[in-house]
A protein has these predicted regions:
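Conserved protein-kinase catalytic-loop segment immediately C-terminal to the catalytic Asp
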Residues: 101, 183-186
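Short loop/turn microsegments at loop-to-beta-strand junctions
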Residues: 97-98, 180-182
Length: 228
């Protein structure tokens, strides 16, 4: 049962509406009572991205069909940010985040690499293009990111070795197969594992040694023989 005195974070099994974060952050009180409507909205938004009429932030058409390949909805308590940095994407607090890539089948050396989630090249390229459309929110986000780019980079460099060590140890005991991305967020002195996905479907994979990467087989059709 949800406590309407608390804030919550919501997503589908594959999509969180991060770029419009206000829809992913459900605030205590009335919004908690209406949480189902927020879930329906981001689920609908993910489905719409699979439409042939879909366009990205730059106006380019393209069907993104992998965003909503799940019926799962996720609700967890919101982690109140301790960071003093400002927000982008309509309410997403900028904090130190690290993306680790692991091979769950390699128990001896599972860590494939660790990268800064707020990658400067990716962020500036994306926000610069969106800003060209004249979107004032994009101008705001681009300006804020540029102001704190070095701060985020230094936070990443100061924590990546410790996080890499912890994730390496964790990966040795995971009951999983295949290669995965694992996202870790720093909040004050605490670190949270906040998301995982198949490595092959994850951004920033191009920064990992391609010789260590392998495709994961996805079972799109359920195996019903076990019920016979």
């Amino acid at each position: 049962q949800l406590d309407n005195a608390k804030d919550y974070f919501i997503k589908t099994g594959t999509y969180s509406s991060k770029f419009d974060f206000r829809n992913a952050h459900v605030v205590k009180g009335k919004e908690v009572d209406e949480l189902g409507e927020y879930l329906l909205y981001i689920h609908y938004l993910a489905n719409m991205m699979a439409s042939p009429l879909n366009t990205d932030a730059q106006g380019n058409a393209g069907c993104i069909y992998g965003v909503s390949t799940t019926n799962e909805w996720v609700v967890r308590e919101y982690i109140n940010p301790a960071s003093s940095l400002p927000e982008i994407y309509h309410g997403l607090k900028m904090q130190n985040e690290l993306r680790c890539f692991i091979d769950a089948d390699n128990k001896e050396d599972p860590l494939l690499g660790i990268v800064q989630y707020w990658n400067p090249d990716v962020m500036k390229k994306h926000l610069d293009k969106v800003s060209e459309t004249g979107n004032p929110d994009a101008y705001h986000d681009y300006t804020i990111y540029k102001m704190y780019e070095e701060t985020l980079k230094n936070q990443f460099l100061n924590t990546k070795d410790m996080v890499a060590e912890q994730i390496t140890e964790l990966a040795k005991h995971l009951n999983l197969h295949g290669q995965w991305s694992v996202d870790v967020m720093q909040n004050g002195d605490d670190f949270y594992l906040i998301d995982m996905a198949l490595a092959q479907d994850s951004a920033l994979l191009d920064q990992i040694d391609s010789e260590r990467l392998k495709q994961s087989e996805e079972n799109w059709l359920p195996d019903l023989s076990r019920f016979v």
